[in-house]
């Protein structure tokens, strides 16, 4: 009886603290710093990766977009593996340290690739694949576990703070992204006074990314035992065997229960779905025909396996289904948002006037505005959610996410309108890309940290890291879709100029009013210029206006449908907001 009374007194004390103290645990700032350096590493590398592949490794833009999308997709597929290993064996802390070291090593191998391509391009390509593979698995160990630990910092009486906590955490993500997108292009994407790119400079950008990841890993290692702890002082994120009953909700099962039949059906489903997606994504590029089907098939399979757990209660099942539904819509957001690293970078490189404040900004650095805006607006957004919650007027998480999807549709509609009359030689003013990134930042702050918070609120603890992995898989599917959609970009001004230098009327070739000779086709192929317009669901993409309208329609429709589903999702969340 005394134990029950003491437990009740502790719970009441925590509730009173939650009402009167808005501050967050110091451990949040440790995770903030660790994630900041990891995002420096990731986004810094991302800013120069496709440019390195195209300019140094002599890959086609379409192929580099597919590789980029596949790489990002796998980076958000492996968190399922990292989440599973963490929940069952290693714990959050060990997985974060392992993942950080792996990513630092991967970036160092990219440094090696960018150092040897001039004398041995095949070795450089091999090192590229090795590096990306190591980074993919390192990210898988790191990403779901640090997000899961943010959620674990708050006892159940303080879960209402998670939207604000993840928005602050997201500010760290984007501070790191800003620094990475500033420093890595400055040292790695260098042009001389004549505008000629130094294709041997990319290595310094990759080296900077590796050093940043080592700093982030060291920060976590040194500070984790002092600050990443429960309110009672117990370390968070240790080995799963060290969990105690207080770590779980009342009546919550502490272990998942999968029947042999469920596991067998999961294997069969994965194989069947792989071949279905392989058929739907027919082509010659192995990224598109092997990696993308694996991402989609494994995501659906694991989602089905989790809800087959016999220990799930009705409330837990409904909440997990909300995570799945929201994840589906977030896929369309990332498919549009992640054009930043592929098609938007190519447009910034080839068809944008980047002259700003008397300086020609490198194309890989244009993405930096997103990081600047997130860092500037994340804290005001967190204050906004706090004030609305205090007045009991805070929108439901799914409404915030529908607003985010709607905003990204608006951003692409504006850019589509401004490229409509560019023609083959006009330049887009950089102010329009800056406006696009501003609106997309508002969209991101309404959607991404809120999604992370929602997973933290709705996940049963025994599935916490794994469900973050599943949630990140929606990002993976979005990134894979981003790669496929990014490859739809039609010929930009530089392609028409190069074709003209070769004596070829590219516009006439694309319009099919002139039949190119075999020699002309060979010249176009050699110079990485397509002789036909890209196709999307049976429609030909003739220009940048049509290209950007694809994203307007995808995200606009997704926003409307998610908003209409909100009453049903509210009911399924069973009191969670």
Regions found by a protein language model. Name each.
Residues 1-26, 156-157, 188-345, 350-355, ...:
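Intracellular loop-helix junctions on the cytosolic face of multi-pass helical membrane proteins
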Residues 88-103, 157, 387-408, 427:
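Cytoplasmic membrane-interface "Motif A"-like loop-to-helix N-cap segments
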Residues 36, 106, 119-145, 327, ...:
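Hydrophobic core of transmembrane alpha-helices in multi-pass small-molecule transporters
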Residues 98-123, 401-425:
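C-terminal ends and interior cores of transmembrane alpha-helices
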Residues 69-88, 104, 143, 178-180, ...:
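Central cavity-lining transmembrane alpha-helices of secondary-active solute carriers
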Residues 74-75, 161-189, 205-216, 367-374, ...:
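Glycine-rich segments within core transmembrane alpha-helices of 12-TM secondary carriers
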Residues 47-67, 189, 288, 340-366:
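Short amphipathic helix-loop junctions that connect adjacent transmembrane helices
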Residues 186-211, 279-291, 393-399, 428, ...:
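A membrane-interface helix-boundary motif in multi-pass transporters
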């Amino acid at each position: 009886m005394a134990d029950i009374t003491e437990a009740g007194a502790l719970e009441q004390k925590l509730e009173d603290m939650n009402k009167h103290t808005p501050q967050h645990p110091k451990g949040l700032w440790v995770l903030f710093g660790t994630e900041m350096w990891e995002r420096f590493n990731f986004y810094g590398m991302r800013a120069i990766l496709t440019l390195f592949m195209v300019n140094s490794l002599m890959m086609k833009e379409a192929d580099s977009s597919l590789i980029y999308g596949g790489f990002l997709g796998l980076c958000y597929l492996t968190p399922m593996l990292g989440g599973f290993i963490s929940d069952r064996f290693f714990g959050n802390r060990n997985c974060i340290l392992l993942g950080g070291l792996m990513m630092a090593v991967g970036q160092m191998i990219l440094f090696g690739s960018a150092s040897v391509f001039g004398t041995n391009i095949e070795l450089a390509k091999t090192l590229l694949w090795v590096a990306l593979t190591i980074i993919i698995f390192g990210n898988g160990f790191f990403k779901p576990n640090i997000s899961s630990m943010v959620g674990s910092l708050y006892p159940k009486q303080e879960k209402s703070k998670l939207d604000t906590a993840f928005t602050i955490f997201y500010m760290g993500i984007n501070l790191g992204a800003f620094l990475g997108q500033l420093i890595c292009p400055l040292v790695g994407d260098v042009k001389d006074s004549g505008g000629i790119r130094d294709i041997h400079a990319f290595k310094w950008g990759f080296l900077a990314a590796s050093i940043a990841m080592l700093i982030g890993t060291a920060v976590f290692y040194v500070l984790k035992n002092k600050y990443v702890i429960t309110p009672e002082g117990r370390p968070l994120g240790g080995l799963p065997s060290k969990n105690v009953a207080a770590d779980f909700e009342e009546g919550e099962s502490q272990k998942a229960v999968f029947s042999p039949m469920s596991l067998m059906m999961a294997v069969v489903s994965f194989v069947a779905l792989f071949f279905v997606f392989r058929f739907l994504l027919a082509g010659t590029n192995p990224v598109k025909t092997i990696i993308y089907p694996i991402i989609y098939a494994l995501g659906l399979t694991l989602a089905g396996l989790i809800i087959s757990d016999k220990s799930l209660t009705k409330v837990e099942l409904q909440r997990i289904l909300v995570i799945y539904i929201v994840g589906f819509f977030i896929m369309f957001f990332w498919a549009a948002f992640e054009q930043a690293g592929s098609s938007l970078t190519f447009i910034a490189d080839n068809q944008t006037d980047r002259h700003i404040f008397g300086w020609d900004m490198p194309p890989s650095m244009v993405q930096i505005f997103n990081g600047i805006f997130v860092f500037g607006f994340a804290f005001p957004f967190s204050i906004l959610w706090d004030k609305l919650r205090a007045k009991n007027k805070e929108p439901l998480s799914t409404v915030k996410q529908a607003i985010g999807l709607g905003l990204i549709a608006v951003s692409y509609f504006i850019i589509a309108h401004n490229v409509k009359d560019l023609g083959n030689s006009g330049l887009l003013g950089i102010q329009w890309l800056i406006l696009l990134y501003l609106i997309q930042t508002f969209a991101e702050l309404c959607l991404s940290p809120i999604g992370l918070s929602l997973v933290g609120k709705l996940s049963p603890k025994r599935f916490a890291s794994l469900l973050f992995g599943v949630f990140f898989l929606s990002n993976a599917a979005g990134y894979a879709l981003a790669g496929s959609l990014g490859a739809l970009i039609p010929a930009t001004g530089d392609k028409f100029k190069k074709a003209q230098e070769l004596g070829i009327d590219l516009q006439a070739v694309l319009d099919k009013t002139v039949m190119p000779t075999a020699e002309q086709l060979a010249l176009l192929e050699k110079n990485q210029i397509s002789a036909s317009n890209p196709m999307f669901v049976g429609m030909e993409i003739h220009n940048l206006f049509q290209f950007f309208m694809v994203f307007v329609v995808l995200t606009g429709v997704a926003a409307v449908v998610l908003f209409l589903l909100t009453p049903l999702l509210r009911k399924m969340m069973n009191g969670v907001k």
